[in-house]
């Protein structure tokens, strides 16, 4: 997570004597959803830098109250993004592009089979960064529960996880990294639906070495066998819309319970 420090100058147009500037949009006014490529008759992937430039344009408009809160849905070409805490020695050497970005967190992978969502949302007064992140997590937790999957938060860790069990350690299904500037969030979440998770093998995802990465497809197959039905990115994105809309209304909500931390034997007794 990354939050820019306040400055002495106002970042957005101001209401003077009750008169709003031309083009002013009150927040929240619901959420507007943009589907980049994934809703096409022949779905296409979007290059990361192209989408990042679009994010910045949308962020400028939302923070200036010239556009409603917007969620950008996208599936990226293979790429690593390195948050501000990433050390150079953590970069992979497999030839996949690495893009340094201005969000919090460390390095992660994006690619085919992963739904990436960028909520560009003006944070109401009193809504802090942690509260915002918890709301994004809650939306994903509720989403995967619609498919019979029990996920949750792990204390001290960001994102959405499946608990440690006899088959392995805690497994992250959704990574979250944001930046807040001009009271408006950008960047967002990456939900693994059915990616080739080998892309994570060349890095320590988000700098966490004692956990694993999973996907909705992998968890569904664990429950129902190899022929389990796996939803498409478009289906998941559509089902997530009303949940995100509810969470981004910033009304009180009941938070899902945390997953208890349990050390897996593989990390209690490492190989010599």
Swiss-Prot record:
Which Pfam families is this protein grouped with?
A: LplA-B_cat (PF21948)
Q: Where in the cell is it found?
A: Cytoplasm
Which keywords appear in this protein's UniProt record, sorted alphabetically? Answer: Acyltransferase, Cytoplasm, Transferase
- Residues the record annotates as the site (Lowers pKa of active site Cys) are 172
Which portions of the chain have biased composition (kind: Polar residues)?
1-12
Renumbered to this chain, region (Disordered) spans 1-20
Task: Provide the protein name.
Answer: Octanoyltransferase
The record's function comment reads:
Catalyzes the transfer of endogenously produced octanoic acid from octanoyl-acyl-carrier-protein onto the lipoyl domains of lipoate-dependent enzymes. Lipoyl-ACP can also act as a substrate although octanoyl-ACP is likely to be the physiological substrate.
Gene behind this chain?
A: lipB
Q: Which reaction does it catalyse?
A: octanoyl-[ACP] + L-lysyl-[protein] = N(6)-octanoyl-L-lysyl-[protein] + holo-[ACP] + H(+)
Other comment: In the reaction, the free carboxyl group of octanoic acid is attached via an amide linkage to the epsilon-amino group of a specific lysine residue of lipoyl domains of lipoate-dependent enzymes.
Q: Which domain of life is it from?
A: Bacteria
Family label:
Belongs to the LipB family.
Q: Where does substrate bind?
A: 103-110, 175-177, 188-190
What is one Gene Ontology biological process annotated in the Swiss-Prot or TrEMBL record?
protein modification process
Which organism's genome codes for this protein?
Answer: Cutibacterium acnes (strain DSM 16379 / KPA171202)
């Amino acid at each position: 997570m990354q939050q820019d420090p306040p400055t002495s100058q106002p970042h957005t147009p101001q209401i003077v004597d009750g008169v709003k500037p031309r083009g002013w949009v009150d927040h929240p006014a619901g959420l507007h959803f943009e589907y980049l490529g994934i809703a096409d008759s022949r779905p296409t992937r979007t290059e990361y830098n192209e989408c990042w430039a679009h994010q910045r344009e949308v962020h400028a408009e939302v923070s200036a109250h010239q556009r409603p809160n917007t969620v950008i849905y996208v599936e990226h070409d293979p790429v690593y993004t390195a948050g501000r805490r990433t050390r150079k020695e953590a970069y992979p050497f497999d030839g996949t592009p690495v893009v340094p970005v201005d969000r919090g967190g460390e390095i992660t992978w994006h690619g085919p089979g992963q739904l990436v969502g960028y909520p560009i949302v003006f944070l109401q007064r009193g809504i802090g960064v942690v509260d915002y992140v918890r709301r994004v997590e809650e939306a994903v937790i509720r989403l995967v529960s619609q498919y019979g999957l029990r996920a949750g938060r792990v204390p001290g860790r960001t994102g959405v996880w499946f608990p440690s069990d006899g088959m392995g350690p805690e497994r992250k299904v959704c990574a979250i990294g944001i930046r807040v500037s001009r009271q408006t969030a950008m960047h967002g979440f990456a939900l693994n639906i059915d990616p080739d998770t080998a892309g994570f093998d060349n890095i320590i995802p988000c700098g966490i070495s004692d956990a694993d990465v999973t996907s909705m497809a992998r968890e569904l197959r664990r429950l129902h066998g190899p022929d389990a039905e796996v939803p498409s990115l478009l289906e998941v994105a559509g089902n997530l819309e009303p949940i995100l809309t509810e969470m981004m209304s910033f009304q009180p909500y009941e938070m899902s319970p945390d997953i208890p931390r349990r050390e897996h034997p593989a990390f209690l007794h490492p190989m010599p």
